[in-house]
């Protein structure tokens, strides 16, 4: 990438809209816009002060034809998104005007921006670190208010500041180690070793606290793949419709009605769920239904959360028990439906298999128990880990991997101190931990990883 050239891209989503925006960033931004913009006073933009919006027209310099009526804003660096000069052209929405203006900007000397290049320049120019850059993408793709809040907190530097504090502790440890190595002819005194050991254990705790939020953070960021399973006609489709609050699945008294997979995205108490209603699991000779059953089993194995539906009005069968046995080691919730009918289901064998799983009795037709289901789902996600109110969550798999490597290294360092191994060994472990943490903020990350991260951004951001 050439950081000294000027880039341009459409910054708004494609399609019809009230406004479309073409963004330009670089040292020649004002020079390029002067070639194609004329204000109502027949002035070029460089004649106006920075940080104001100017009304006028984009003019094709070859034909002198008006391309569109626009509002243009000019922001002089370094106090801009990229820390470079930025020009934004607000034109009429729709593909034709924004496409024509972008083509004109490129024709007079700008280069088409790569995906995420504006944000990448903000990172390379030191306005934000890598964790903050990734938070911008999370803000755009947030599925819930909680996801948005966590991403905004990360953009404001909550994670970066915490990581920086831990790295400072590691640097302090390195300084003590290097001083001791410089005076290697003297034995390292117990006071110095005690100090290093206490610091090392403190860093372990700091990193572990961050890692403890990672499972919840991943769910907040990416959503929870939730599969509803059970025999045919137990109420799986009714549950999907009740949670979505509209009729998405066909509900009949005929077993095997749902033959395909029905998927809905919804937000339950701040948790983004990808809720999947599957074909009823049973032995069948129907070819189409059989395919649906096989797909149900595949999704069952891949799901983050399983909701098992049972019918309170029917006796427990071997088929039910086989399904229950499958969830023994999974995050799962058991729902007993049709409690408004005569009860025939014996819960004792179920409770013996899944002693730690929550069982909720509901009547979906009477709309009884739905709130309890939603509360149970939220409790299962947040149980034992980060709470919904927490803003500092590790949501990114890349960050989690870096933290795990940092923790492994400092644990090795702690062991080396306890065993009174040569301090050169301790130094290597501390440095490895420090470097791993630096990957989160981009201080010690490889260039190809940076390129990969920004390729996932949209063009114009």
UniProtKB/Swiss-Prot annotation:
Top EC group: hydrolase
Cofactor(s) the protein requires to work: K(+)
Pfam families with a match to the protein in the record: MMR_HSR1, MnmE_helical, TrmE_N
Subunit description: Homodimer. Heterotetramer of two MnmE and two MnmG subunits.
List of residues binding (6S)-5-formyl-5,6,7,8-tetrahydrofolate: 23, 88, 127, 461
EC number annotated for this UniProt entry: 3.6.-.-
Organism: Alkaliphilus oremlandii (strain OhILAs)
UniProt domain TrmE-type G: residue ranges: 223-382
Residues where GTP binds: 233-238, 252-258, 277-280
Gene Ontology CC: cytosol
Family stated for the protein in its record: Belongs to the TRAFAC class TrmE-Era-EngA-EngB-Septin-like GTPase superfamily. TrmE GTPase family.
Cofactor, free-text remark: Binds 1 potassium ion per subunit.
UniProt-annotated location(s): Cytoplasm
InterPro entries reported in the protein's UniProt record: G_TrmE, GTP-bd, GTP-bd_TrmE_N, GTPase_MnmE, MnmE_dom2, MnmE_helical, P-loop_NTPase, Small_GTP-bd
One function term, GO molecular function aspect: GTPase activity
Keywords, sorted A to Z: Cytoplasm, GTP-binding, Hydrolase, Magnesium, Metal-binding, Nucleotide-binding, Potassium, tRNA processing
List of residues binding Mg(2+): 237, 258
Protein name: tRNA modification GTPase MnmE
Lineage of origin: Bacteria, Bacillati, Bacillota, Clostridia, Peptostreptococcales
Its biological purpose: Exhibits a very high intrinsic GTPase hydrolysis rate. Involved in the addition of a carboxymethylaminomethyl (cmnm) group at the wobble position (U34) of certain tRNAs, forming tRNA-cmnm(5)s(2)U34.
Single GO BP term: tRNA methylation
